[in-house]
Regions:
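N-terminal hydrophobic targeting/anchoring segments and the immediately downstream early-domain regions
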Residues: 2-165, 170, 202, 215, ...
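Catalytic beta/alpha-barrel core
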Residues: 98-99, 184-191
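Short, surface-exposed connector motifs at secondary-structure boundaries
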Residues: 116, 176-184, 305
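A generic "binding-loop/recognition-motif" signal
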Residues: 152, 191-192
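Alpha-helix-loop-beta-strand connector modules within alpha/beta enzyme cores
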Residues: 167-181, 199-207
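Short, well-ordered alpha-helical microsegments
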Residues: 193-197
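Catalytic glutamate of the conserved HExxH
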Residues: 212
């Protein structure tokens, strides 16, 4: 990058010079709409379609998420169906701006039509009753990634917050094998450490941590150890950096986010870091980041630090799309 380019960047001209592609691995926008009302086109949250339009290309994993404590009286599988109905409604009502995608090829078609590419995930297999038949139903609905646990332990494994000593049960192992056979991404964010290593042992292809940071940079059980991130590299997977302040550090800002990213890069993760903002599911974000509309600040900061544009585009979009192309083939 030439000196003149750096001068322009330092003046904040990045929006005029670069068109940004972004593929984010996790948001809770569906459950936000389910709980509070409203829709995808315009909201007061972290993410909406009016803001995704600012990017040249934008893809997002939208998570179906629910906690029985927050929705008493609604069985979790029924909650899954209700949130799926919200997702389908928003796809239909905003068909001019967004389309449900199942493969990377479908995302490319969405981009060509000037639309946001929406992928569907499930955060916590308890929403599928940890049941293989419901896993297959979810895949038929277009789900392409599943967190094995949320914060609660379930019939598949312990989590990072409950029964942390417990790894995958036999049913959990069957679930992982079936997900790989179905072309679905196994998501290890929220999983217990032992559960993580069981997944790493079982998976023959890429798996991912959709929204997890570095435990070496900030010690939180939800973050990844260096050994875990190295295992993700060895499986050609990705880790999506989370924008929740409590997983970044004390009074975080853009430099804190960069610190997590750079630590993963030092471990050899140039093709294995992605974005996973946890948008609309978090209460605190780093200073200067109110939602996806501010992600250009991170893009600009990385270029100011002499990251190549090719590397930044990998971190923001291409790495996660590569994994989707490899795993979600049908």
């Amino acid at each position: 990058m030439g000196a003149q380019q750096l001068i322009y960047i330092s003046k904040g001209r990045i929006r005029d010079m670069y068109e940004i592609d972004l593929f984010d691995g996790h948001c809770d926008t569906i459950s936000r709409c389910f709980e509070r009302g409203g829709g995808f086109r315009r909201s007061g949250g972290h993410l909406d379609l009016e803001r995704t339009r600012k990017f040249r290309r934008y893809a997002q994993f939208f998570a179906i998420f629910g906690d029985s404590a927050a929705t008493p009286g609604i069985p979790l599988w029924e909650l899954t169906q209700r949130e799926y109905a919200v997702f389908r409604r928003e796809m239909a009502e905003n068909a001019d701006l967004i389309v449900h995608c199942r493969t990377g090829g479908e995302a490319e078609a969405a981009y060509a039509a000037g639309k946001t590419a929406a992928f569907l995930s499930v955060e916590g297999a308890e929403l599928l009753d940890c049941d293989l038949h419901k896993l297959e139903e979810a895949r038929a609905m277009g789900v392409r990634a599943v967190n094995l646990t949320w914060n609660h332990a379930n019939a598949l494994s312990g989590s990072n917050a409950e029964e942390t000593h417990r790894g995958l049960t036999e049913r959990g192992r069957e679930f992982v094998r079936r997900m790989e056979a179905l072309g679905m991404l196994v998501d290890v964010s929220h999983l217990s450490d032992r559960g993580f290593w069981d997944v790493a042992e079982l998976c023959t292809g890429p798996f991912f941590a959709s929204h997890s940071n570095s435990r070496a940079v900030f010690s939180a059980p939800r973050n990844l150890t260096d050994a875990q991130f190295t295992a993700i590299i060895e499986h050609h997977g990705v880790a999506g950096l989370n924008m929740f302040s409590d997983f970044l550090g004390e009074d975080p800002d853009v430099e804190t986010v960069v610190a997590h990213l750079e630590h993963f890069l030092e471990l050899g993760g140039g093709k294995n870091v992605a974005r996973g903002g946890d948008w609309d599911g978090i209460s605190k974000t780093p200073r200067g980041f109110g939602g996806i509309q501010d992600m250009d600040r991170l893009f600009e900061r990385l270029l100011q630090r002499n990251y190549t544009e090719a590397l930044v585009r990998d971190l923001f979009h291409n790495n996660l799309m590569r994994v989707v192309n490899e795993v979600c083939t049908m």
